[in-house]
Amino acid sequence: LVLVGGDVVVGKKGCETEKAFGFLKKLSETYPVYYASGNHEQRIVEHPEIYGEVGKRYEAAVEELPLLRLRNRKVQVEKKGIPLTICGLEPDERFYEKGRRKEGMVEELEKRFGQPDRDRITILLAHNPRYKKEYLSWGATVTFCGHYHGGVMMLGKRRGAISPDFRIFPAECGGIHKKGEHAVIVSAGLGEHTIPLRIHNPRELTILRICALQNRKMPVK
């Protein structure tokens, strides 16, 4: 299955969505696709006063595709006998604001999805890696994040030059971040941010293999 974690479009005035739609159409005709929003999709939908009707038209078109759109939804599926719960988080916009980290992300997750079922593998699509500690505390087995696009220029495996909220050298631009049996995987992504620049920052497609163990613990390697 294919998990799409958002920012398939670039949310700016006059943005076009045809390429994003074409990509999702081709992908969903071949694979089962689960698609959660990034902040770019979220803002073109929530702010028509800035972006016009492009967000509304984009969402209507995507709804016609053979994929599952996860806007604060969770679905249960089974793959090769392994029970999975896939959650797509679209948080309150304040969690994308610049400045200090906002309180209440765990409560946001509980409000949207309840508590993770310990008898299932819970996969969380949560675009913003700044709240990785909260995702780990909530208890998702694996959380997929992006948002930083590798921080423009990568400095090692995790640290980038700058984040979208203008923090210098953030430590969550890539890599795997673990806590016990839980992991957050941050991808540098396939595209660019609003400014199309990548330095020592190759495009990244994450492939995850989940194997069932008898005790149902699912370590990420």
PLM regions: where:
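Acidic/histidine-rich helix-loop elements
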Residues: 8-16, 42-53, 94-103, 157-169, ...
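Solvent-exposed loop/turn segments at secondary-structure junctions
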Residues: 8-11, 39-43, 75-77, 91-94, ...
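Beta-strand-turn-beta hairpins that frame and shape the catalytic cleft
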Residues: 67-68, 74-87, 178-184, 210, ...
